[in-house]
Design a protein with these regions (language model features):
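Flexible, glycine/proline-enriched loop segments at strand-loop-helix junctions
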Residues: 112-123, 170-181
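Conserved small/polar residues in nucleotide/adenosyl-binding loops
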Residues: 198-204
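Extreme N-terminal starter segment of soluble prokaryotic enzymes
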Residues: 1-3
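A short acidic Gly-Thr/Ser loop motif
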Residues: 6-11, 34, 200
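Conserved phosphate-binding catalytic cores of ATP/NTP-utilizing and phosphoryl-transfer enzymes
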Residues: 124-136, 180-197
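Conserved active-site "lid/cap" helical segment
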Residues: 37-85, 129
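Short glycine-rich, Thr/Ser-proximal phosphate-binding strand/loop in the N-terminal lobe
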Residues: 12-56
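Short beta-strand-loop/turn "lid" adjacent to the catalytic site in phosphate-handling enzymes
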Residues: 70, 76-122, 142-144, 151-159
Length: 204
């Protein structure tokens, strides 16, 4: 099973293609400086590598380049995007709308785009990348969005409200959301695993 992982930033589009039977990296790269003087860097798991300047007016063109480097030329690793079993996208801001990972639909993309007021540098590029991916991935291929804010969604109100007029929260949605939740989830999971191993060893 091959999984494509995408991280669309404000002016970049990073990706990794993983072989999930051993979680090895088949290919990875970055379309950088989107909207300026674009540049692509791509590398395969067996060491093939390209660096070239490209024109990326938007994340849509960057995603088209991503497809090109995966399916053709010196960095070709698949014959077509149909070889990809699923796609995962990292999304910065889920606000109070998205509290867990979910499948991508047109409605989900629209909601992510609408939350750009809370993450203006990130959420609109996320939506562009999602739409571009949806256009080139065969219909029926599951796409999943993972939100940085989801890990922190159980914060109590007394922790996430600021000492500001309450209307700042009710009208403008100004509150603490928490970020880098995917990293926090991984670290906390690893900590629990290591502590469990340690306590098991101590018991023996």
């Amino acid at each position: 099973m091959k999984i494509l992982v995408v991280n669309a930033g404000s002016s970049s589009l990073k990706y990794q293609l993983l072989d999930m039977k051993d979680e090895s990296v088949i290919a990875k790269g970055n379309c950088d400086r989107i909207g300026i003087d674009g540049h692509v860097s791509a590398k395969t798991g067996d060491g093939r590598h390209i660096e070239e300047d490209c024109n990326f007016p938007t994340h849509t063109e960057a995603f088209e380049k991503l497809v090109e480097v995966l399916t053709s030329g010196e960095t070709k690793v698949i014959d077509s995007m149909s070889e990809i079993s699923a796609v995962g996208h990292r999304i910065v801001q889920g606000a109070e709308v998205f509290k867990e990972t979910c499948l991508v639909t047109d409605e989900v993309i629209d909601q992510i785009d609408a939350l750009a007021e809370l993450a203006p540098v990130h959420n609109h590029p996320h939506a562009l990348a999602l739409r571009a991916c949806k256009a080139v991935i065969p219909a029926g291929t599951p796409q999943v969005v993972v939100f940085d804010t989801a890990f922190h969604s159980t914060m109590p109100r007394k922790a996430y409200l600021y000492g500001l007029p309450y209307e700042c929260y009710t009208d403008l949605h100004v509150r603490k959301y928490g970020f880098h939740g995917t990293s926090h989830r991984f670290v906390s999971g690893e900590l629990a695993r290591v502590c469990l191993l340690y306590t098991s060893d101590a018991a023996d």
